[in-house]
Structure formats: C-alpha cells, structure tokens
Amino acid sequence: MLVTLVFTMALTSIGFAQTKQVPKTLSYEKAVELAIKNSLDIKQIDRKLQKIETTNKELDKTSERLSIPGIDYPEKEDDWNQLLYSLEKEDKEKKLNEFSARYTKRMLEDTIRNLFHSIESSVLDLQDYDQQIQLKQKELQIAKVRYSVGKISRYDYDSIKTSLEGMKRTKEQKRLELQKQKLELNKYLRLNNLDEYTLVSIPYQYQPITLTDAELNSHAVRASHTNMDVVAKENGISLQQLLIDQNLVLGNRKIQQEDVYIANTENLKLKEDIREGVKREYANLKLTEERIELLLYRKEVMKQELQNDMVRLKYGKISKFSIEEKKMQLSELERQYTESVKEYELAKIHFQNLYVSGSNL
C-alpha cells in the first residue's frame, strides 16, 4: 500500500495562516537541505577540519626541518616521536570529524523525517477531531430532543454533553501540540514564517522486513562499529596507546596502560549494548507488523459490516445516524492503519541506518 498525502499548514481551523496566493511547498528533501545548511554542529566540524588542515601544514614544516641531513642532537628522537604522534593524532581527528559530519547529517535526516511525520499526524488528528465533534454535536441534538420527551435520562444526556466537551479540550491540546512541533521543526529550518508553506508528505510503502538470525547479528555488529560514541572512544583509546608506545606519557606507564585496558572494556560493553538495542528494534518492528495485519483485518470486517448496515438502512432497520457512526469508526481504523504503516516505515529506516540503529538504548 502506497501512502501518499499532502498535508497543509494553511488551515485556519487549526491556527494556520490563510492566503489567496499559491501556497509554497516544502519537501522533506528541501527541509533536510535547510537543516544541514543551518546546522551549527556541522559548521563547527568544518572549522575543526580547517584547523586540522592548518596544523598539518605546520607539521609538514617540522618534518622537513627534522629531515635536514647532518643535523643530529639528543632531543631529535623525542622530536620525531612527538611528530609521529602529532601526525597520527591529526589524521585520526580528521577522520573522526569527517565521520561526525556524516553522522550529524544522518541524524538531521532522521529528526526532520520524524518531525514531518509528527506534524502530518497532528494535522490529520485535528481534522479527525473536527469530524468527531460534528458527529457528537448531532448526537447531542438528538439526545436533547429525546430527553425533552422522556426517552432518555438526564444522566445519559449529560454524559453525551460531557463527552463533547472532552473532545473539544482534547482538540485544543492537539492544536497546542502541533504548534510545538512546528516550532521544533523551524528550529532547524529557520524560515521567517513556516505557516506560509505546505509540507509535502513523505510517501511510505509498507514492506515488511525479514532477517535471518545471522543477518540480524551481522547488522547489529556493523551498527555497533559505526556508532558515533564507539568511534570516538576507539579514537581516543588508539591515541592514548600511541602516547604510551612513543614514551610520551607522564607518570606511571603501567597505570596508563591499565587505563587503556579499562577504556577498551567499557567500549566493548557499549558495543554489546548497541547490538542488543538493534535486536530490540527488530523485535519491535515484528510486533508492529502484527498490529498492522490486525488493523487490516479489522478494516475489512468493518467494511463488510457497513455494507450490511446499508442494506438494513434501506429497509428501515437502523438509523442514518448509526451509519454515520459506523463510517466514522471505519475512518478511524483507516487512520490508525495509515499511521501504523508510517510509524513502521520510520522505525524501519531508523533500524536500517547503521549510523543510528540501536542508538536509542
């Protein structure tokens, strides 16, 4: 099933600006481009890479000076050791920052995708609440007449009225939640007025994922090796070991080596936690698949019931209001199904992305 929707942020019923001009559209891809462009983290990484480039040029000059033939002095060996360490350090720092840039971009993609989904869901929820409130208002009008002629009790009438008031309060909460989501999205995009834009929904096609135990284990291992925290820790451990090997450490060398062993053990534990996190994500995906299949079954049953009720309505066996209620129930199942498919595909993208898979421990 291909779920393709366009959800507007120009609906006055939920507090969006209304304009006679042709609305501007904002795609997910464009939003990611803006988020990356505005990212202070990525700008900071770029500055670090520029600094590394400058440092490497200075190290090249030092290397040339130490390589001049005929020059020899007692400290030269220490200078070479320090130079080798500095070259290795800058090389690792460069690779780490390049990795960090890729990681940050992937995380931004993940964040913007989730915010697009959350905003769309909130817009659809508000539209759904509008329909439910309209139906409940009709129900209240009917109940008022029935109460006036003694067909229902005051308690029944008040219950319907209270339910309607509760729906209105929930709708207001949803509206405030939507405003919060919009502010969060614009924190990354920095547009002058996000309400001027129509967000183009990301299409999702429901495709269940199936992995063998070996494939799942392999994915978990790869994810544990590409996690940002793991890579950063390994980088630090490697540099500390190099300091020890080059006799550049201060203090007790044995204690320094023990610190390296401890850090290695901690990193192994972190990798194990990430692998377990990946497996939990996969288990949750399979549970969501079951929920989607159940919703699909309930949808088909509800459609059949609605067809039967249409026949009963024709012969006066049920009221038109009952048909409207059943249509609302079917609409709610359709919404739940669509929402579950999107949530599944979002979770699947997160799972398949080695940079972030298993990171929500």
Predicted features by range, described:
Residues 43-47, 75-105, 130, 155, ...:
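Sec/SRP-type N-terminal targeting helices
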